[in-house]
Amino acid sequence: MNQLNETDYGTPAKVSAQQVTLEIDGVSVTVPAGTSVMRAAVEAGINVPKLCATDSLEPFGSCRLCLVEIEGPDGRRMKGYPASCTTPCAPGMKVQTQTPKLADIRRGVMELYISDHPLDCLTCPTNGNCELQDMAGAVGLREVRYGDEGENHLSLKKDESNPYFTYDPSKCIVCNRCVRACEETQGTFALTINGRGFESRVSAGQMDSFMESECVSCGACVQACPTATLTEKTVIMLGQAEHSAITTCAYCGVGGAFKAEMKGNQVVRMVPYKDGKANHGHSCVKGRFAWGYATHKDRITKPMIRSKITDPWREVSWDEALQYAASEFRRIQAKHGKQAIGGITSSRCTNEEAYLVQKLVRTAFGNNNVDTCARVCHSPTGYGLKQTLGESAGTQTFDSVMFSDVILIIGANPASAHPVFASQMKRRLRQGAKLIVIDPRTTEMVKSPHIQADYHLKLRPGTNVALITALAHVILSEGLQSEDYIVERCDLQSYQDWQQFVLREENSPEAMEAICGVPAAQIRGAARLFATGGNGAIYYGLGVTEHAQGSTMVMGIANLAMVTGNVGREGVGVNPLRGQNNVQGSCDMGSFPHELPGYRHISDATVRASFEQVWGVTLDPEPGLRIPNMFDAALDGSFKGLYCEGEDIAQSDPDTQHVAAALEAMECIVVQDLFLNETAKYAHVFLPGSSFLEKDGTFTNAERRISRVRKVMPSKSGKSDWEVTVALAAALGYPMSYTHPSQIMDEIAALTPSFAGVSYDKLERLGSIQWPCNESAPQGTPIMHIGGFIRGKGKFINTQYFATDEKVTLRFPLILTTGRILSQYNVGAQTRRTENSQWHSEDKLEIHPHDAEDRGIRDDDWVAIESRAGQTVLRATVTERVQPGVVYTTFHFPESGANVITTDNSDWATNCPEYKVTAVQVMPVSQPSQWQQQYQRFHNEQQGLLQGDKVMSEPLVTK
């Protein structure tokens, strides 16, 4: 799909049941009521000159280029020359866009713009892609009567501070598009106009540089700029793109659509695709700019093998690497049994690639020892929503939030983890929706420009279930439940049992206040607001799932949505904000050890039979090992081999020293990745992976939206990830006959009811599809559970609160919770290899001023964080974002060792680790921890082995 040049309609589309017919330059056109004359003209094939107008922003009417002449239905001419961008169409209008008078006015306006603009077009980086240049040609400007006396642009300096784009004020025409984009699209309000008249210029904050300002580098201003004022540095360096392809972002679960603009096989820039249904032409700093990792010097592009992790790596051919891996896996199974090996799928890879890895494990390995990174993030979502609503996924589209009246955010900070969706949510909040935030920290969603939470329930980490039950207690005890909805849509016996449980006095806000640390009055106020405020939508993240009662909390959220009647229509719903680009898809594809694709249990003989017929093997009916079980089995000697595609378990999983010991105990680890990550340091075979720019396939985002990933450059290693898995399966004696990922999707559709109607042809036609997509929903399902729940009747489940085993003590008096930051992503393997590290180059520990003062800790001091699992050292950030008794850090840098501290506690139903609650002590120190010193030695040795050095490596385990 080459979409290098998209049509700009000048103003946003309007939705209306009423249609208006008018005449523009003699052409009859019918448009929805409220449509601007400018947009109607473009739809009629008539382009009106413009500079301040663009269809991603509300009309502004400042440039005066789009003036038109209008005659009303009564034949009277409208006074003056109205701006077509701000004038709505009316029935019977007759519009003239091209008259001698209009041409004269436009040339005069353009002449004024040009009089204070450098005329260096031939050497300008946007030459050939500049709207000012285009408009000068469109209006027929051939000369400028004004001399260059008094020009001020020559003295204005560029701002080069941002690593991704430049700001050249000399080329600014003060159209306000960048300022408006920052306000309307992004919602950061970082830009303004300083000065008056010819002195007017765009300013980031109070005349700060872009890097010093509140700018979050989303790129909306760069995208909106009609001149070279704001220009990507890659465009300056490489020149204008020659062709493009539409693909899908490989970062968070928003799954934004992008145009990869190319020059040959080189990416010039990534531009958010305005017809993308998940992101609507918006982006964040990661998707817009942080794609350089794909060509980073650290990429490993040749297969490598070694016998022991103390041996140097040896580059080999693909055939030798695959045969070596296959022979080692077969040797292990012959010696230790069929269950001694397993595989891990990747949530960064495509649906097709995840499907093939689980297929390889179940066919070539002959067991169900397959798992995915969702184990450590959203496995409780799959379990909890399946039990209550009947499907292991969120209920809504992202666009649904624009119809919400009350938004409840629990354990999530979309501004950091899902920033494009956060911008959409903020837009709705600025329009008047109410906001409740449940979070132990004060995040950007609690308070930011023009956003203020109505309630911030700042609970103690680990007490989610107590709080959600207390909210339900208020609703039931005050008669605020949606009785008709419950009777019609829900299982009444489960409701009555749950109602009896919730109404116990022990679940009242007054009783739970002592547990949660949230005043009862706040709990009551928030509950009343959610129950009575209209359409109520719940959005939650890892602050819900990564707890000992993560699954219980997910069920509690579903209970709250059902009791208030907030499932099954626009503006409501239960919406998990999934972290990685394809974590939803990897789960859909059967990456759990107990489920085949489509969340169907492996023990179901009928389900197994359908797969056995297509796959040509007999499947093991017993569920396999989860990731934590694999580690435990490795340490007891029964699990010896692992195929790990695109997942860094050594950095991302909890209790690092336990994980390291398990990896060292294995005899053959095959890692397939872009870089020699932390897990690869324990590997015996390295198979080079491919980035999202080097492959075809699909991703499924947090709203169940299946979108195409398109190959825009040759694979650095010569193979896409799906081709590597196919080749490994063949080496293991199980041939797979695919020549393109579309064939894999056809097989998925044939075997998976929720994907039955999905095909690459349909994706080409529709752009994207939200599953379920089948005979009953051939175009997909934007909103689930309309008219009835997938499971039949919604089921209420009692959510008894149990305190976590991880409790504060005299030795460990603080609670550590972990999370993410905007500029970095997951374990940082991609973003650390981009300029994003200029914003966040290390993990730091947030600590409240009271706790810091008690320990003699100042801002930026080195501090030791110790738990029962281990110790690491970080710099301190003293801040009131955290409450007293709580500390917080991120996990983006391996040397930080955030997961050295986290423990083996996990969710009771799914083994999702309890990352959000770890009892710790924090004290000032002057040197790295023992683990960090040992890590650095091990890292240096492994880098040496990559270069072919022979060294003796000590284990990365503190005995």
Language-model region placement:
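Glycine/threonine-rich phosphate-binding loop and adjacent beta-strand/alpha-helix elements that clamp
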Residues: F398, E694-P714, V724-G733
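Terminal leader/tail segments of proteins
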Residues: M1-T21
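A basic, amphipathic helix-loop patch mediating RNA/tRNA/ribosome contacts
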Residues: V37-E71
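Long, low-complexity segments enriched in small/aliphatic residues
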Residues: S586-C587, F592, P741-E835
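Long, contiguous, secondary-structure-rich segments that constitute the structural scaffold
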Residues: S715-E775, T834-E846, H850-K959
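Short beta-alpha connecting loops at secondary-structure transitions
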Residues: L22-E23, P91-T97, M207, Q452-L459, ...
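Fe-S ferredoxin-like electron-transfer domains
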Residues: N2-Y9, R64-S217, V222-T248, K263-V267
